[in-house]
Curated annotation (Swiss-Prot):
Protein name listed in UniProt: Uncharacterized protein MJ0769
InterPro entries, per database record: Homeodomain-like_sf, Resolvase_HTH_dom
SUPFAM superfamilies: Homeodomain-like
Molecular-function annotations in GO: DNA binding; DNA strand exchange activity
Pfam families documented for this protein: HTH_7
Coiled-coil ranges per UniProt: none
Length: 169
């Protein structure tokens, strides 16, 4: 099998060379998504497929990841926990939102969960200070703490029960 990697839109003479290679052996043509989806490639891809050439789209990112120091990465995580959006964080730190997203996407779920827990604790403290924290609320908060890590839907229902209970109190 012959593998050919292309990173630009091929000319027709280049396509004919690929077709000639097909006469000798199977041909696998690898190209980036941007080239695959380009309007000029529609007829060329159709022609190649008719000639028995296999086409594979590579999803690899082009270029290098922008380097950000560890201190900035920590700041990105702190700002996410505080509730800032990716765009706002980019504006605050003076870096692009795609760079912020690159460094946040792997742990954003955990960071948002941490923010949620922080808000629950603040709400609990607020209720204690206002004198609305009762034993039944304490049980609901304990149940919320136990479920928040593994079942967010159940945690949401418990939180709704807490809010309903506070409004009735």
């Amino acid at each position: 099998m012959i593998e050919i990697k292309i990173s630009k839109i091929p000319r027709w003479d280049e396509i004919n060379k690929i077709v000639k290679l097909r006469e000798k052996d199977l041909v696998l043509l690898k190209l980036p998504k941007s080239v695959y989806e380009h309007p000029k490639m529609a007829y060329k891809l159709e022609y190649l497929k008719k000639k028995g050439i296999f086409i594979e789209v590579e999803n690899a990112k082009r270029g290098r990841k922008r380097k950000v120091d560890d201190e900035t990465v920590k700041k990105i995580h702190e700002l996410i926990i505080e509730g800032y959006s990716v765009r706002e964080i980019g504006n605050i730190l003076g870096i692009g939102k795609s760079t912020v997203w690159d460094y946040a996407k792997d742990c954003i779920k955990e960071l948002k969960l941490e923010r949620f827990k922080k808000l629950v604790w603040e709400y609990r403290e607020y209720l204690i200070n206002k004198g609305k924290y009762s034993p039944s609320l304490q049980v609901l908060f304990l149940e919320l703490e136990a479920t928040v890590d593994y079942d967010l839907e159940k945690a949401k229902k418990i939180l709704e029960d807490i809010i309903k209970h506070v409004k009735e109190f």
